Amino acid sequence: MMVSNVKVYDLEESIIASGYPMRTTAEMRPVDEKDIKRCINLSNACNTGNGAHGQYLTGIRVAFDLTCSNKMWVEAERYRFLEFVSSQSTMHRITKFDLSNQYNEYVDPRVIEIMKEKVDAYNNFCNDIDFGLIPQDVGLQLELQEEKKKRYLEILYTNPAGFELTARLTTNYRCLKNIYIQRKDHRLPEWRKFCAWIETLPMFKELCLSGDDNG
């Protein structure tokens, strides 16, 4: 699991905006200690059951690239506000990846060898068709295309859960707080590592974990 190309937006602006409900003016200014104290109090209120006080956290936006296994991706997709910008695709490119470097350490090497064999056989089969090494009358062309589809599907469905892909994601501190609380002690080491990264985000601990045992 790896996180890279991280951008955090509207941190100070959202901290200031957290005070809007109790103000009669709404100008932007530098963040001061009073603002931080207010946000910590809001965090404490959230962590004791009043989640509405954490609304301002939705304004602190985070964009990043995440590289992780298919297994983690399936679980990540349940978070509505963890949005995909774009991602690598096994559906389009499974036969083009360097499989020697695409799996995490928990994938059985025998499975990787099976995948390599299937991909090599598929690519050789396609090359033979493209270069006319297989005689092609009209009837045979249909059979070859069906065989090609079948072999590709075998590769897709044989590919193990430890295959790693990269996606660009966008989310906010409120969503990341939920992920952190739910996943910090998860069985998958990828989730624990991801939660450790969340802790490094600017002021995340102060704004999201103050007064909470999860910190």
Task: Kindly label every feature range from the protein language model.
Residues 1-215:
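Family-specific signature for flavin-dependent thymidylate synthase
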